[in-house]
């Protein structure tokens, strides 16, 4: 069986948007022994501030570039991009020791590690990819990991909104030939056999026609993780689709957010648009060839076979 340890001693996160409602435990973790970068400073009491923390920017503020400003006046000015000026950089960060977190697991520092039941990939996609789906098996899950891609955000250098491939959501950390990396995943699946973790893909960032996020995210992501846990426990069934297993109606707990995530919105979040997925197939073939093979990499045959099978299922 696969076991895991966390080699990190703490957490880091993007500050803007983090508040007591969106991520209570993350905010609680920053109350002591925390490093902040590129946030705003409230000069009156020497505390930090960022957009989304609350609706009261400090009047006596130092914005992230170091200028002393009246925060309320500063954030009311529309910048060159047509949006209000920001006191904190959009990608400003905090990093805090794990022991600060109120809900840190007692197993966090277990030297024996903890058993892994699920591996969850995730990209940032405005369309195409549903809220959550499960692979058919380990090899299919490895293909899903190889196909992870995201529209760029403020966290990446370059234009925002451009699709970038991010295999396993680990591109900056894959330190050797990516084909060998994928082959290692496939080999691990053979070793683990029926004890291999189930593999899932999530997308918290699907948007509606007006460009608004349809899923509330943050703490409500636990609702999707709850479905994943139940799938691992074998207590619920799932709907088989061309791309993998999707939740059945009623299996994601929406209690308390029914007004925000209506049945119609959930249908959109879980919709598999075959036309968009066929475009995804073409892009994956281009990516495998131009970005990997043509640059000296190699693609395991099992992944090409998975791509072919996906195309066949979409064409049925």
Can you describe what each PLM-predicted range is?
Residues 1-46:
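Catalytic or ion-translocation cores adjacent to nucleophile or general acid/base/metal-coordination motifs
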Residues 48-316:
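Flexible, glycine-rich loop/tail regions that form catalytic "lids" or insertion modules at the edges
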């Amino acid at each position: 069986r696969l076991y895991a340890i966390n080699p990190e001693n703490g957490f880091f996160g993007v500050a803007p948007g983090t508040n007591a409602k969106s991520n209570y435990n993350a905010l609680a973790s920053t109350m002591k022994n925390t490093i902040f970068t590129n946030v705003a400073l409230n000069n009156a009491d020497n505390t930090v501030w960022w957009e989304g923390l609350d609706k009261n920017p400090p009047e006596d503020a130092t914005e992230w570039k170091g200028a002393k400003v009246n925060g309320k006046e500063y954030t009311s000015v529309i910048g060159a991009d047509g949006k209000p000026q920001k006191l904190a950089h959009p990608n400003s960060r905090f990093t805090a020791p794990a022991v600060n977190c109120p809900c840190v697991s007692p197993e966090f520092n277990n030297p024996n590690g903890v058993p892994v039941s699920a591996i969850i990939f995730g990209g940032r996609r405005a369309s195409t990819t549903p809220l959550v789906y499960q692979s058919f098996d380990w090899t299919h899950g490895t293909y899903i990991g190889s196909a992870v891609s995201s529209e760029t955000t403020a966290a990446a250098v370059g234009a925002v909104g451009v699709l970038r491939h991010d295999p396993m959501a680990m591109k900056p950390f894959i330190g050797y030939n990516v084909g060998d990396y994928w082959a290692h995943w496939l080999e691990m699946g053979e070793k683990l056999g029926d004890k291999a973790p189930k593999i899932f893909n999530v997308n918290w960032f699907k948007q509606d026609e007006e460009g608004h996020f349809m899923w509330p995210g943050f703490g409500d992501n636990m609702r999707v993780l709850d479905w994943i846990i139940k799938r691992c426990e074998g207590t619920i069934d799932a709907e088989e689709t061309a791309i993998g297993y999707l939740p059945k109606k009623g299996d994601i707990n929406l209690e308390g957010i029914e007004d925000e995530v209506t049945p119609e919105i959930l249908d959109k979040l879980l919709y598999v648009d075959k036309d968009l997925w066929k475009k995804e197939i073409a892009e994956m073939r281009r990516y495998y060839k131009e970005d990997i093979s043509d640059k000296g990499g190699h693609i395991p045959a099992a992944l090409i076979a998975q791509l072919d099978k996906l195309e066949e299922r979409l064409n049925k």
